[in-house]
């Protein structure tokens, strides 16, 4: 039996639309992500468990884990009879890389079960392909950090899909999921087909400056450059209370904030534990909309997807 855990991730990070993402893990030790178990069997089966299992498609072939198994078998050129279990702990359409968690855990578990026939680069390419079936286009800003850990910059040149960017140990990521769903496809459809020249220049300046600040170890500058001129001005209308929440967390002391992925999760970066706790308390009282919502104080998950049992 192989059991693999794949962590939540926060894509875009305001400054890097479709090219930047970070894996995150709660500081209290909770596992924020999906778990997939693979066992040898006579025929294929898939069982769904976990807090958000009831939100999965009722038709098994529409389940992304089934599609991962099917695509992996195709890659190896043979049928692999296994019993798979998906522990769906991540809300769907949350902006926390929910589909990436399932895809990464499923493909990594299959690869481990079969003795690692695929290298990490090929595996990551498959992960991007499968996750793209749900989000509508291939982009690696969730699957890369989820699989490899840390903060990842998408390269997609010279056979390099992504490379790690150094983060800051003092940064605490407060993630508030309000309990409503925003589909990635819907959030992409709301974006303009073309952008003004000054917005393109500002975006390039912010992203280049952010990467420079990370490598030159300037956390204050890095946080100051986490601005989004590409998606947030258009997507915030999909998120009730988002603008007020951003203003409130800034007043409490967050050094940066924005939409996690395509939303509705809000992220707020803090550089002090007491500030992070106050931000989390405010968001828990004011940004959450129902019982499915939650707030976690997180750090970068530098390990990425990992085998829990083998």
Swiss-Prot record:
UniProt EC number: 2.7.1.39
Pathway the protein takes part in: Amino-acid biosynthesis; L-threonine biosynthesis; L-threonine from L-aspartate: step 4/5
Recorded GO MF terms: ATP binding; homoserine kinase activity
Keyword Nucleotide-binding included in the entry's annotation: yes
Residues the entry annotates as binding ATP: 91-101
Main subcellular location of this protein, as a coarse class: cytoplasm
Statement: the UniProt record of this protein carries the keyword Ribosomal protein: no
Gene3D superfamilies: 3.30.230.10, GHMP kinase, C-terminal domain (3.30.70.890)
GO biological-process terms attached to the record: threonine biosynthetic process
PROSITE patterns, per database record: GHMP_KINASES_ATP
Enzyme class: transferase
GO annotation, cellular component aspect: cytoplasm
Keyword annotations from UniProtKB, A to Z: Amino-acid biosynthesis, ATP-binding, Cytoplasm, Kinase, Nucleotide-binding, Threonine biosynthesis, Transferase
Subcellular location: Cytoplasm
Catalysed conversion reaction: L-homoserine + ATP = O-phospho-L-homoserine + ADP + H(+)
Chain's role: Catalyzes the ATP-dependent phosphorylation of L-homoserine to L-homoserine phosphate.
PANTHER family named in the record: HOMOSERINE KINASE (PTHR20861:SF1), HOMOSERINE/4-DIPHOSPHOCYTIDYL-2-C-METHYL-D-ERYTHRITOL KINASE (PTHR20861)
Family note: Belongs to the GHMP kinase family. Homoserine kinase subfamily.
Name the record gives this protein: Homoserine kinase
Species the sequence originates in: Escherichia coli O1:K1 / APEC
Organism lineage string: Bacteria, Pseudomonadati, Pseudomonadota, Gammaproteobacteria, Enterobacterales
